[in-house]
Amino acid sequence: MKLNLHFAFFVTDYFIQENKIKYLYLMNYIKKLQQSDEFEYCEGATSEEIQIVETSLGVLLPEVYVKFLSECGSCNFGDTYINGVYKEDGILSYPIIELTKQLREELNLPDDFIVLNYEIDEYLILYKVSKTDHLNDSKVYDAEIHCNKDGNFVMSKPTLLFNSFDEYFEDFLELADDY
């Protein structure tokens, strides 16, 4: 019994440490990009503001994305954005809610996706979320938007782009390295 209990503590401690490392990893990148003139970010979202996002969209946000929101709300590098909660100089808006709801209505975006980034006529980046489970992280997808023969915009089936938000964020950071 002691061996099993010891193993359980070891495994639990390992997962706690792994999550702390992932969070520090994300924070270190944000600090790195704060030094760039091209990187713009907002004030971090409060837990109440994050709850508004979840309630408004009827989803539970993955923990990694919650940590991102609490660190910098939303951000951009040049003309590439990661949507979230915009909070700066007393102005508060929720582009993640607005854009996700708009595309749910206009394109029948499934309820288990939120819109991380959308550039009209270029690309749509989606983050898989759950309505019932608090996930640690989830997959990031892209989808194409095109006009059908009736003149209506339609969305293609989402295809896997990254296995995690962390991978997506790393790709975002490469913009700074390439700049």
Question: What kind of feature is each model-predicted range?
Answer:
Residues 121-123, 132, 147-148:
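Short Gly/Pro-enriched loop/turn and capping motifs at secondary-structure junctions
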Residues 140-142:
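Short aromatic-glycine-(Arg/Gly/Cys) micro-motifs in beta-strand/loop hairpins
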Residues 157-171:
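Alpha-helix N-cap recognition
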Residues 22-125, 175-179:
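A surface-exposed partner-binding patch
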Residues 146-151, 156:
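Compact, glycine/acidic-enriched structural inserts
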Residues 131-137:
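A short alpha->loop->secondary-structure connector
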Residues 1-25:
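N-terminal amphipathic/basic-hydrophobic helices that include classical n-h-c signal peptides
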